[in-house]
Swiss-Prot record:
Protein name: Ribosomal RNA small subunit methyltransferase G
Catalytic activity: guanosine(527) in 16S rRNA + S-adenosyl-L-methionine = N(7)-methylguanosine(527) in 16S rRNA + S-adenosyl-L-homocysteine
Annotated binding of S-adenosyl-L-methionine, by residue: 89, 94, 140-141, 159
E.C. number: 2.1.1.170
Primary location: cytoplasm
Length: 228
């Protein structure tokens, strides 16, 4: 499959939504980054017709619920000149693909167990020329630094992977010293936090405000003893 741009009128509408949304999040986008994000929406819509990557079909809702939702975490993750990032259960590439676009100095790895999703991620990487992005297929708990992945990660993030306690249990062996696990959630996950495994703790909880989306969003940062 090759990238297909959305019809001009639709792309213009999406571009205005993206520009306004990114500005409200205090995320500056270059022309290249903006165009890559819009091309990503077009690719996601095209592949979704065949591979069912997301339940959201409308391009404007894709932009809000996928792109802007992913961009909303960027200000909280920044502060590193470079970072190694693992996106667990990435699906259609969220949020990792968005992070790779807006943070070109970060090395981002997308992980999923479904081959067709990895195929979409790989194709999107090629079409958008994201040299800082890699894709690995398999269960996160089986990934080994120096084997399936090059090394441990400073940031391990997930948007829709699992219960927080399960996420921490499965991914904690991949956290680099000084690194953290970051979970994107809807309503504040009090019950999930209460079930966090021994040797892990919440460092901070942030309420996210996603432009044009009337829904609760939270970002939870978890530290694990292995990364101290």
């Amino acid at each position: 499959m090759t990238a297909r741009r959305a019809p001009a009128v639709n792309r213009d509408v999406l571009e205005r939504m993206l520009v306004d949304g990114a500005a409200s999040l205090d995320v500056a986008l270059s022309d290249t980054q903006r165009n890559r994000l819009l091309d990503y929406v077009a690719l996601l819509g095209k592949w979704n017709a065949v591979y069912n990557l997301t339940a959201i079909r409308d391009p404007q809702q894709m932009l809000i619920q996928h792109i802007l939702d992913s961009l909303s975490i960027v200000p909280h993750l920044r502060g590193r000149a470079s970072a190694r990032v693992l996106d667990v259960g990435s699906g259609g590439g969220l949020p990792g693909l968005v992070l790779a676009i807006v943070e070109p100095d970060w090395q981002v790895t997308l992980n999923d167990i479904v081959q067709k999703k990895s195929a979409f991620q790989t194709q999107t990487r090629a079409e958008l020329k994201l040299t800082n992005l890699s894709v690995v297929t398999g269960r996160v708990e089986t990934l080994r630094p120096g084997v399936e992945v090059p090394e441990k990660f400073d940031i391990i993030v997930s948007r829709a992977f699992a219960d927080l306690s399960d996420f921490v249990k499965l991914a904690r062996h991949l956290v680099a010293p000084g690194g953290s696990i970051w979970a994107m959630k809807g309503v504040h996950p009090d019950d999930e936090i209460a079930r966090l495994p021994e040797g892990s703790r919440v460092k901070q909880t942030m309420r996210l405000a996603v432009p044009m989306l009337d829904a609760e969003r939270h970002l939870i940062e978890v530290a694990v003893d292995e990364a101290i």
